[in-house]
Design a protein with these regions (language model features):
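Hydrophobic transmembrane alpha-helical segments in integral membrane proteins
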Residues: 1-12, 49, 53-54, 150-151
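Alpha-helical transmembrane segments and their membrane-interface exit regions
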Residues: 15-16, 37-38, 59-69, 109-120
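Alpha-helical transmembrane-segment detector that highlights a single hydrophobic TM helix
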Residues: 47-76
Length: 154
């Protein structure tokens, strides 16, 4: 499961690299760039350093949430983007800080995945956020698949 997760998030990072060439907003560009860097740190380094990649990725999800709130986009799209970023941020925070109920937050990753499917139909309205949201949703899908894998293995 680990190699599947690493491959999947790496593909999302490659998609983010392609999105970097289309982004004209500096904040969205930097968020996407640092998400790609945090994924590289998490995958390419060993146990003492990879933890910092996860912390950076979680912090960038919070920054992306603030960025989404501050953007002047349609309210419906803003709510959908927040439905993607906020649960993933909370789930990763619960896991990283080893708080209780982190497994329950992983079950709620169905919300970002389903919301992302609806957002894809409105991708013309999202000029700069598609790379950010794709990487965040990929993380949510990996968490959701790990929950399903645990259910089927037990």
């Amino acid at each position: 499961m680990l190699y599947i997760a690493q491959t999947t998030i790496s593909l999302a990072a490659v998609f983010g690299i392609f999105q970097l060439f289309r982004i004209r907003n500096r904040a969205a560009f930097l968020i996407t760039l640092f998400q790609i860097i945090s994924i590289a740190i998490s995958i390419l380094t060993g146990p003492p350093v990879e933890k910092y990649g996860f912390y950076l990725f979680d912090t960038l999800i919070l920054v992306a949430t603030i960025y989404i709130i501050s953007q002047s986009i349609m309210l419906r799209l803003k709510i959908q983007l927040l439905l993607i970023s906020v649960p993933v941020f909370l789930s990763m925070s619960f896991k990283l800080f080893q708080w209780p109920y982190s497994y329950e937050w992983s079950i709620l990753m169905i919300i970002p995945v389903l919301t992302y499917i609806t957002v894809l139909f409105q991708r013309k309205e999202m000029k700069h956020e598609l790379g950010i949201v794709t990487i965040i949703t990929t993380e949510a899908a990996i968490e959701l698949l790990s929950v399903f894998a645990n259910w089927f293995n037990s």
